[in-house]
């Protein structure tokens, strides 16, 4: 009988820990973001300037597409026109003026993304944005990279209270 009780307790403990394991696995890492953003920038750069340019942008608007994973997604800013060009989670942002969209502290974070045009290896930036289901802003970090020689910048972000921008920039350099 004691063996059966131990198995039952162990089984219950395992079942109760599964949601925590699933949650931990669903969080994207900065390394994953760097890789996905680089892949997305390459894919977009190849389509821009061809007859497939519109399809190149549309791939980033698909909520169930390859550019949405774990707890994050790829977004695209057209820095030449200063507009949000693609956003799979908030399609109402597409076409909006990137200079007028502010984080919860009043910063034009989407416009800051365009600083990536000047940095060949991309940039990390921080801003405050509500987590899904919340109203107050939480620190969010995003990596942004220019798509080839275009005016498009591709980015993705995660909520993170720990990593510094300097640490993330070093990580980006090591990931080359």
Question: Locations of the language-model features?
Answer:
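N-terminal membrane-sensor/transducer module of prokaryotic signaling receptors
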Residues: 2, 8, 14-176
């Amino acid at each position: 009988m004691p063996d059966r009780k131990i198995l039952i307790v162990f089984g219950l403990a395992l079942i109760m820990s599964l949601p925590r394991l699933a949650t931990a696995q669903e969080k994207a890492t900065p390394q994953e973001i760097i890789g996905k953003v680089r892949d997305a920038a390459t894919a977009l750069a190849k389509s821009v300037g061809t007859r497939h340019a519109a399809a190149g942008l549309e791939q980033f608007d698909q909520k169930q597409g390859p550019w949405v994973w774990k707890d994050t997604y790829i977004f695209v800013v057209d820095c030449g026109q200063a507009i949000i060009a693609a956003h799979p989670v908030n399609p109402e942002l597409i076409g909006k003026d990137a200079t007028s969209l502010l984080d919860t502290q009043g910063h034009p974070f989407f416009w800051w993304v365009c600083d990536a045009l000047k940095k060949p290896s991309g940039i990390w930036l921080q801003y405050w944005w509500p987590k899904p289901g919340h109203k107050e802003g939480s620190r969010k970090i995003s990596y942004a990279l220019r798509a080839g020689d275009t005016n498009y910048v591709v980015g993705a972000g995660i909520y993170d209270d720990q990593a510094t921008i300097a640490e993330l920039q070093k990580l980006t350099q090591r990931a080359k």
